[in-house]
Amino acid sequence: MTRRKSKRLALPALAVMIAAAVAVPAFAQTAPRSTTLRAVGEVTFKANRYVKDSLRFNRDTVTIRKGGTLTISDITKQPHSFSLVKKGQIPRTMRQMENCFGKGPCDDLAVAHGAINPDTGEEQDPTTPLVNVGPAGFNQPGDSVLIPPSGKVKVKITGSSDKYYLCAIHPWMLGKVKVGR
């Protein structure tokens, strides 16, 4: 095959590859209408040696369509929360994680759930399993739901922008909800 002929054959092949690269995103799958996030891991203890806590959510990022249903389930047999917070409230260091309590968002969420008496500061059984601070659905920081041990809950993601979440009981359990279309 001559050099000229191979160039003539390469040009249409290149055009087909470029067209395919442009067309594939146009046909890309939209975000799902429903998905599940799981609390997984365990706490282990060995006397005079260690306490190891591997509790976490099974995904760092969850993608879901606006108006979609997110199911949060627990297999750890521990209580958890799924709480929306501002991006800047997501802890990235041990100190930030510890500061979630006290004057941080974890205590604010505990008070909102009725798990801390705001007058005395004492812990108590939560009285409000679902906290919705704005319009109906999960759409802004402060929206929060409690997940009972071995239980599951469903929430509707109604906001259109990405959300950041953590467990107000175990603030190292955290992630992002990517809201798609």
Question: What function would you assign to each model-found segment?
Answer:
Residues 7-9, 35:
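Residue-level detector of intrinsically disordered/flexible regions characterized by low predicted structural confidence
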